[in-house]
Amino acid sequence: MGEQSLAGKKVAILAADMFERVELEQPRKALDEAGAKIEIVSIHDGQIQGFDHFDPKNKVRVDKTVEEVSADDYDALFIPGGVGNPDQLRGDENAVNLVREFATSGKPIAAICHAPWVLVEAGVARGRTLTSWPTLQTDVRNAGGTWVDKEVVVDDGIVTSRKPDDIPAFNKKMLEEFAEGTHARRDVAELAGRTAGAA
């Protein structure tokens, strides 16, 4: 498959302080090179602090807060990892609701490393196959999802990966899914039924 064009597509990057720098910067670069219009969305305005593991690195300017946006404003959602970043996001009702809006509207979502924690919190993991940083596998399973140890997993428009080493494969699948666009709409209740039916 050739290079994916995201010209005319608008992508929200949902992140908070303590995001893993490489997991935001490299996918953002891939999105930018594909022609996407990108906005950093966070739980507060100003800047958010990036980290290389536990070492503070660069800050990123926030374009909009979660209170100012909805899934209707974007074509796709990307959530970078880092331990503190998704932990803050999943504790913020507006951030969780935004992720849920993307999922129920069928718009593609990409999440790497610890970011699937936010998918768990939003009820998006239920009935889906995901990967993540390995320590999240129990959380994914307890939320009704199936966890697998693969560099990248795509389940109906949801792209997940485990760690920074997976970024090349993650970026490729993210661009493919974001270019494909909206998948079938479904609500969280339907996802719950899908899991019950599979049991």
Descriptions of predicted regions:
Residues 113:
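Catalytic nucleophile serine of serine hydrolases
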Residues 1-105, 109, 117-129, 137-199:
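Extended, subdomain-level signal for the structured scaffold at the beginning of enzyme domains
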